[in-house]
Amino acid sequence: TSILSSMDAASREEFDFLSNITMQWNLLMDFVCYIERHNIDSAERFIASIETIDRVDFMYGIFSGLLPRQTVKEALEGNLEALDTDSPIFRHYVSVERARWLIEHEKDVRTRISTFLKVYWEQVFSRLWQDIGVRELDCLADERRLLGQIGAESYIRNCHPQIVIEQGAIRFEKQVELSYRRTDIENVVVIISAFIAPDLMVNCVEGCLTIYKGISLPLRSSVEVSEEI
């Protein structure tokens, strides 16, 4: 039985609502990428912080740093015309209508995300993490050893077949191709995850490029993980 099918009707309805407004959770993952630059050492504290974080920071992270912080601030203060409809973010990433709706309902969205994630963590994911998290940590030694053997550039390239490193840029051959100039990247963070493969997930905010590397966990015990997680 999948995790979602075991939810009560109200929880499933809330999951579907939040999934829809965050583009199947992609916008929330961008926010997590933004916050994770400062390390998330406690899921409980991170979830609780969603409701108290500065609202400009919240929306800036939701939009993956693709909208200038000043633009986000002006829009939150009521000037929705500050959102430039010709911006690439609205052509390739999120519609301007969705962006305006999220900004207008920012407080309610934050509260509902925080409330749902708290329930999800306590009732579902914390139990899985007790096993999966430990096994992900076990993989770190192998990843560090590989990094030392082949060097940073080759390691990054080998995180996913859609990553292309060129002389002046790093390119990601996704449905909407992404490319970042090397001079715009101050540091690279690679996060290993058992939930990403085979997809490529990347984010670059304020010079910090985050790449999620999908890994296969060593078999230690039988834990079934639903694709819907």
Label the predicted regions:
Residues Q70-C208:
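DNA-contacting interfaces and partner/effector-binding or oligomerization modules
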Residues L217-P218:
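Long, highly charged low-complexity segments enriched in Glu/Asp and Lys/Arg with interspersed Ser/Thr
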Residues E227-I229:
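Helix-turn-helix DNA-binding segment
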Residues T1-F116:
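N-terminal low-complexity or simple alpha-helical regulatory segments
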